[in-house]
Each structure stands twice: as C-alpha cells, then as structure tokens.
Amino acid sequence: MNLVLMGLPGAGKGTQAERIVEDFGIPHISTGDMFRAAMKEETDLGLEAKSYIDKGELVPDEVTIGIVRERLGKNDCDGGFLLDGFPRTVAQAEALEEILKGLGKSIDHVINIQVDKDALMERLTGRRICKNCGATYHLVFNPPAKENVCDKCGGELYQREDDNEATVSTRLEVNMKQTQPLLDFYEDKGYLVNIDGQKHINEVYADIKELLGGRDK
C-alpha cells in the first residue's frame, strides 16, 4: 500500500501516521528522516544535501528527489510506504510519479487531513510551555490546574513567539497557497481522499482505516 499523507500544520498528521504504520506494517518516510539517514550513511546525495543544510540553504529538488528515489528503492518499501512531507510541489509530485513508475509501483491514496483554519488557529495558538521545566500544556485540550502556572514545578507558562496568532495565521496562509496546486494535481489523478480531521483522533483514524480496508494482512 503506497500512501502520501497531507495536511496543514496542526491537522494531526503525526498522530495518524503513527497509527497507520503500526497497523499496516509499512515504513513512515518523512523528508527529515530521509535527509538524516542519507547524511548518516554518507551517500553521495546525503553529503550533497548536508552541504546545503550546513549553509542554511534549501536542498535543491534534484537532490531531494534523488534521496527519495534511493529510499523508496529499499527492501522495507516492497510492501508499501507512507510518505510524509514529500512531495511539496507539483514538480516534486511529477518526479515521484516517475520514480514509482521506474520501481513498478504507483500511489494508492493521497490522504489529506482537512481541518478548517479557525480550528487550526485554536490548536496552534493554545500551546503554553513552562519557562522552568519545559512541560507543555494547551489552554483548551490540556490546561494547567492554575492559570499560567506549571502543574509540575510551579514555573511560569509562556507562549512561544512562533505560536502567536499573527505568526500562526501567516504560516497557515502560506501553507494553504503552497498546498492547493498539489491537492488539485492529485484530485485530477483520482488519488486524493479528504478526511475530516475535526473529529476525535480515534474517529479520524477509523475513517482512514475504513478507506484502507481495515488491517492489512
């Protein structure tokens, strides 16, 4: 089963990815993990990627695509895979089609976890962190017993700058604009399946599991 997982920041991709790979016995392949593994193994492409990352530059598409090609060609992908964080653009999606064609494979589903912007804002701006011990809370989903005070150590809670409304709103807008052409591409291909991510996480996974046909034997 060859899957691509999509969703905006805060949509809950990580939680659902963990469940899918555990239930269906396929590797969870994220862009970050691929880069780290290629750099650790010191492959030619891994070393090339490292040279860009060390300079704080974006890794060019041809290097990223080469690393994806190497990773999908490994034995643990014979029974399928879950791609997360790749592709990000239509050009990368077209390259992925060519990679899979060369491996005699194709995408089964592109799972897009949909959550509206207001709900994402609530999820992403509600996080609070203890200045003292680093414990994480959420004003709605996991609030401290006493406002702005850590349950564990009594330290003061704060909101990271990245989590304020203006920053989160901008990040979501940028992601939406970047993601839409990719969603259109996969919808035209007939791969795209939208999953309602505003339900409880167990209900979201039940919908995904139903799509995938229950537990893979």
UniProtKB/Swiss-Prot annotation:
It is found in: Cytoplasm. Residues 126-163 are annotated as: LID. Zn(2+) binds at C130, C133, C150, C153. One of its GO terms (biological process) is AMP salvage. ATP binds at G10, A11, G12, K13, G14, T15, R127, T136, Y137, K199. Pathway: Purine metabolism; AMP biosynthesis via salvage pathway; AMP from ADP: step 1/1. One of its GO terms (cellular component) is cytoplasm. GO terms for molecular function: adenylate kinase activity; ATP binding; zinc ion binding. Belongs to the adenylate kinase family. Consists of three domains, a large central CORE domain and two small peripheral domains, NMPbind and LID, which undergo movements during catalysis. The LID domain closes over the site of phosphoryl transfer upon ATP binding. Assembling and dissambling the active center during each catalytic cycle provides an effective means to prevent ATP hydrolysis. Some bacteria have evolved a zinc-coordinating structure that stabilizes the LID domain. Monomer. This is Adenylate kinase. It comes from Bacillus licheniformis (strain ATCC 14580 / DSM 13 / JCM 2505 / CCUG 7422 / NBRC 12200 / NCIMB 9375 / NCTC 10341 / NRRL NRS-1264 / Gibson 46).
